[in-house]
Design a protein with these regions (language model features):
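Short aromatic-enriched loop/helix-cap "lid" or pocket-rim segments at secondary-structure transitions
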Residues: 38-41, 107-108, 197
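Proline-centered flexible-loop/turn and helix-kink motifs
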Residues: 21-22, 209
Length: 266
C-alpha cells in the first residue's frame, strides 16, 4: 500500500469509528503510530479499538465497520481479542477489540491515541513501554548462550535423521530467540533505539548490519550449514568472554559436522 493510500485508510477507519457512539476510542500502534518508524509499502495497519462493554464481540465477528470491508478475503481470530484481516490487495490489518477494562491485556511500545471518549489515554499509557528491553544478567546470558548451543545441536540431529521441518525450526527460529537478545546487549552500536523492545528479532540488521548480514547469510544456507554459520557468529562475538562455554561449543561443532556427513549419506 502506498503512503497516501495508507494514510487514507487510517483516516477512513478513524472517521467511521468516531461516528459510532459505541466506540470509546482508537489507538494506532507500531509503525501505524508513525512515531519512531514510518510505515512503508509492506506495513500493515496495527491498532486496537475500545468499545462500550458488551459490544466487543460484535466488532470481532462482523466487519462492516472496516473500510473496504467488501474486499476482505480472509479473517483469522488470532486470540480472544485479536484478529488478522487480509484484503484482496494483499494489505493486512492486525487489531484487537477491547472494552476499557480489557486494555490492560495488551502490550504497546510506539502508539498514538487517535481519539478518546474517556479513559483510553490513561489505560494505554499504563501498558506502554518505550524503555529498552531489560538488561540481561550474567546468569541470563549464560542460560541464553547455553540454550542456543543446545538448540543448534537438537536441530541438526533432527535434520540428520530426516526430520527436516522440525530441525530447521530449531536452527532457524528457536536458536535466534535466545541468541539475538545476547548479541543486542553485547555488540557495540552508535544507537540501539531502533531495536524493538517487544521483539528482539525486529530491525536487528539495521542496528548491527555486519553481524546481521552474517546471520542472514547463514540462514540462506542448507540447514546444517545454517547451524554452522550461526555457531560461527556465536564464537566470533562471544568466544572471548571469560564465562563462554568453549568446550560445549567445540562439542556442538563436532556434532554438526557429524550431522552434515549423516545428512549427505542419506
Amino acid at each position: 500500500m502506498n503512503p497516501d493510500a495508507y494514510l487514507d485508510f487510517a483516516r477512513r477507519l478513524q472517521a467511521g469509528l468516531e461516528a459510532d457512539k459505541r466506540v470509546l476510542g482508537l489507538v494506532f500502534a507500531g509503525s501505524s503510530a508513525q512515531q519512531s518508524h514510518i510505515p512503508d509499502e509492506w506495513s500493515d495497519h496495527d491498532f486496537f479499538v475500545v468499545t462500550a462493554d458488551g459490544v466487543q464481540e460484535g466488532f470481532r465477528t462482523s466487519y462492516e465497520w472496516l473500510p473496504d470491508h467488501e474486499q476482505i478475503v480472509l479473517s483469522v481470530r488470532e486470540t480472544e481479542h485479536g484478529l488478522k484481516i487480509l484484503y484482496a490487495s494483499g494489505h493486512m490489518l492486525e487489531f484487537a477489540i477491547f472494552n476499557l477494562e480489557e486494555v490492560g491485556r495488551a502490550r504497546l511500545n510506539d502508539y498514538t491515541v487517535a481519539f478518546d471518549r474517556g479513559g483510553l489515554a490513561v489505560a494505554a499509557g499504563a501498558i506502554a513501554s518505550s524503555v529498552p528491553a531489560p538488561e540481561l544478567t550474567p546468569a541470563d546470558i549464560q542460560r541464553h548462550v547455553g540454550m542456543a548451543l543446545c538448540l543448534l545441536l537438537v536441530g541438526a540431529g533432527r535434520v540428520a535423521r530426516g526430520e527436516g521441518i522440525s530441525g530447521q525450526v530449531f536452527i532457524r527460529s528457536h536458536t535466534l530467540h535466545h541468541l539475538l537478545p545476547v548479541l543486542e546487549q553485547t555488540l557495540p552500536a552508535a544507537d540501539k533505539s531502533a531495536l524493538d523492545n517487544l521483539d528482539p528479532l525486529r530491525r536487528f540488521e539495521r542496528v548491527f548490519p555486519a553481524v546481521g548480514a552474517q546471520i542472514n547469510a547463514a540462514l540462506n544456507r542448507d540447514a546444517i550449514g545454517a547451524a554452522m554459520g550461526i555457531l560461527d557468529v556465536i564464537e566470533q562475538v562471544l568466544g572471548d568472554k571469560a564465562d563462554f562455554p568453549t568446550a560445549a561449543a567445540a562439542t556442538v561443532r563436532s556434532v554438526l559436522k557429524r550431522a552434515a556427513h549423516s545428512e549427505a549419506a542419506h
